[in-house]
Amino acid sequence: MKFYLISLGCPKNLTNSEEFTARLLANGHKMVFEAEKADEIIINTCGFIASAVKEAKDEIRYALELKQKGIVKKVAVTGCLVERFKEEVLKEFPQIDTLFSIAAQEKIEDTLKQKGTVLSPLPSSLYLPPYKMSLTSTHTAYLKVADGCNNRCAYCTIPFIRGNYRSKPMADVVREAKLMIENGVKEISLIAQDTTSYGMDLYGKPNLLGLLEKLLKLKGLGRLRIMYAYPHRMTRELAKLMGATDKIFHYVDIPLQHIADPVLKRMNRHCDATQIRQTLDMLKTEIPDVSLRTNFIVGFPEETKKDFNELKKFVREYEFDNMGVFEYFREKGTAAYAMKQIPAAVKHERAAELVEVQSRVIDKINKRLIGTTLEAISDGENFGRTYKDAPDIDGKVTFTRPVPAGTIFKARVVSAHGYERTVEPLN
């Protein structure tokens, strides 16, 4: 069978795609990179928020149009949209050949032979996948250390989709990282819905620190990057370890979502403004050159003008290197769905205003960056990223001279505009 893959959503979903794609290839199937050349189209969907649902449905319509025209024979759909809205998807798209759950991806070859809906319960544990391939570049990869979430934030659908938090055993994570290194990966990004909770279900308490200590012993390790850290679980011991090694990029992705205490409480974020500030100050003390990335939600139910002004002031004060701004989406099944909603126009206005605040922050950061030396990684001969930039979501840098892809090197910043910078390789 020749198959064409459409993988949507976050890096966690991408790792699922990498695992079942590798299973298919190992069993003699062929992956093609043009939909029109495929026998079957497989769509791994996202269903996290309304915009992701719309994107997934648009891709399903596209695939079914090709099937109707006789260009492809089958269409299979899996992923978070299926977990969350399987009945709705079946009703809207009865022409789908196979609709299958995330758990059913583990036996994808058998699953695709079946017609209709193939559902399996989410596994109670994670383990080293028997097959794995990279759907990104050869020098950077995502390593999922856990799946699911126990935080139960009031706006979030992830626990309904992915289930409770389940860590991958430490030995399996280390083996997977070792395989990545042997295959030429230079940058390993550790991901989960909450990376800093790693191990709490297996070892009785979070143990990301212990995992990092083992990963740092791997021969040939390039760099690690930590994504999706929660502020109330980012410990001083973790920060000290990061600050003491050059094998972990001095970068922390730490989604904060808000800073006003009334909003944080309604969000059920398990921390308050004081704790957030203490965590950020601690990170800056223990890792003086730390680069912080975060996300904020504006227009959350009952967010007042005072709350929003506090958020703007906070963004100006802490000067995040990278920042995502999202308008609150009202999602059925979440605690926030029943709360008093804010008009769409107000949410849109506040999002634009916060983006403008961050734009001015970036201008200030860029002025300080000119002439400084940063660690960088090459994604192609003429472009890449600094340690301040994660794959896919952050900014890019252009090189003044070619550097082989996958090279980690020192570079001097020669110009900077917004999130785009030009650097001069130094070695």
Kindly label every feature range from the protein language model:
Residues 47-52, 185-210, 214, 218, ...:
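Conserved glycine-rich "GG(E/T)P / GGGxP" loop and the immediately following alpha-helix
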Residues 330, 338-427:
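Terminal RNA-binding accessory module
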Residues 1-198, 237-240, 248, 252, ...:
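Proteins enriched for Cys/Gly/acidic motifs involved in redox and nucleic-acid/cofactor modification
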